Amino acid sequence: YYGKEVNDPPNADIKEIILSGGDPLALTDVQLFELIAAIEAIPHVKRLRIHSRLPIVLPQRITLELCQRLAHSHLDCVMVVHANHANELGKDVAQACALLRQHQVQLLNQSVLLAHVNDTLTCLKELSERLFEFGIMPYYLHLPDHVAGTTHFFVNLKRGQSLVAK
């Protein structure tokens, strides 16, 4: 079952489970709720962190049922959304984020620094301000992975460090 590797043998050092890779919110509610229940059954786990781009690109995925299930959990629930530009943060996203916050889900953001998309100080400031308006804490800023066909988005480490320093 889910969580067997975390709890057999018991590893009390594990306090947080992260659902990531692909997109966990692409699961059906039934699948996701089953997974959450399995995680809740692990006594030493205190936090559930869900990484997802769907609240940004498909905010309708954030349903009342999903939010109620997360609020019902004894786990501290954190959702890390993936927004890269302030223009992604429209009214529907604001409503989805408000619903999550109303159900005690902490919201963090993960951005990828992309050349010619968000690699200016102005753009990053606008993104951060918009995230704060939506109740989302800017948290992670990554450089792009080296994947075939994406070299035109690459920002070098020195450029990234320079932007963060400003």
Which residue ranges define each predicted feature?
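Glycine-rich active-site/cofactor-binding loop and its immediate structural neighborhood
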Residues: Y1-N7
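Conserved AdoMet/S-adenosylmethionine-binding subsite of the radical SAM
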Residues: N7-E16, L25-K166
